[in-house]
C-alpha cells in the first residue's frame, strides 16, 4: 500500500512474537518467482573464485511488481535431500528495487563450479622501432585454454571474462 513516498508491506501470515523478541517472517512466495541462475568468472575481480548469481525482474509477469521492494537482506535457500530440508545457497543485501527493475543478486562463491584458464602459448609480433633502433611497441598474441568444471548435478551457465592489458 502506497502512503506518500512510503510503502506499507503486508505479511500474509500470523504469528505471536513475545515482548522484547524479534522474528523474521516470510514476505514473498518465492517458489513462484522465475529466477535465472548463472555464474561469473573474472579473475581480475574475484580471483580464482566462480561467483553465483540469481537474476529476476520486479514485475507483474514475474509474480512481483505490485510495489517496489524495500532495502534489506536477501538469503537464498534450496530444498535438499529426501526430507527437503533447506540448504543455504548464499545471501546479499539489496537497496530499494523499483517496479520493472532487473535485479542481480550476488550469492557469493560456489566451490562446485571451477574455471581454470591456462596460458598455452604467446608470441610477440609487429615490432615497431624508433629511429635509433630501440623497440617502441609490439603486439602480443596469446593462446589460452579455459577449463570449466561443473561438479553440480545440474547444467550451469558460466560467463567467463578475460581482461587483456594494453594501451
Residue ranges and their predicted role:
Residues 1-167:
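Long, intrinsically disordered, low-complexity accessory segments associated with secretion
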